[in-house]
């Protein structure tokens, strides 16, 4: 099977790192549980441009260099890689491609999984691409994803989704093309 895997908050615990950075820099006490949507400006009480600037500052910080894998992700990816063709499809902007490659080489050193950047969380002037378009181009049969907008986009385009459960996607209800998973063990057993 051809499987796409999201990076942030599916493979990489980016929200944990982002909140450590944000709480330290802005003297806040946010937890992952507070983030029930991806409207960071509303949660952080700032403008959308300010929220994007804060995220970009985080991308450039040492916190970004110290991100940990999501629990069970490394073992799960190795397990899936033995039986399936894997592709990382991420909303990350291309300007952090080098940091992304370094992280993948550190945590998944013996795997050569291609990475596709869709630039979805980037300034308007950068070319963005829908994850569903990347998945269709790659003939992806299943994507593991946490972002509601990407989940909806993929389901609308008839791509099966394993919804990695996070506070910002709890309102989504399973459908024929959408199944909620809570752990990487759930992911592997659902695919096997």
Regions picked out by a protein language model, each given a short descriptive name:
Residues 65, 73-103, 116-118:
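Substrate-recognition element of Asp-dependent hydrolases with the DxDx(T/V) motif
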């Amino acid at each position: 099977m051809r499987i796409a895997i999201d990076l942030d908050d599916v493979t990489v615990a980016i929200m944990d790192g982002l909140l450590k950075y944000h709480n330290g820099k802005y003297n806040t006490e946010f937890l992952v549980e507070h983030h029930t949507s991806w409207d960071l400006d509303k949660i952080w009480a700032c403008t959308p441009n300010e929220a994007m600037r804060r995220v970009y500052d985080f991308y450039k910080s040492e916190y970004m260099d110290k991100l940990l894998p999501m629990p069970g992700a490394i073992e799960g990816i190795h397990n899936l890689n033995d039986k399936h063709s894997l592709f990382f499809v991420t909303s990350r902007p291309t300007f952090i491609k080098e940091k992304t490659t370094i992280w993948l080489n550190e945590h998944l050193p013996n795997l050569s999984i291609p990475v596709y950047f869709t630039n979805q969380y980037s300034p308007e002037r950068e070319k963005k691409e829908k994850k569903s378009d990347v998945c269709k181009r790659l003939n992806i049969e299943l994507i593991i994803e946490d972002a509601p907008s990407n989940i909806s986009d993929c389901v609308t385009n008839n791509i099966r989704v394993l919804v990695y459960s996070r506070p910002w996607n709890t309102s989504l209800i399973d459908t024929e093309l959408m199944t909620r998973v809570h752990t990487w063990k759930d992911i592997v057993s659902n695919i096997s």
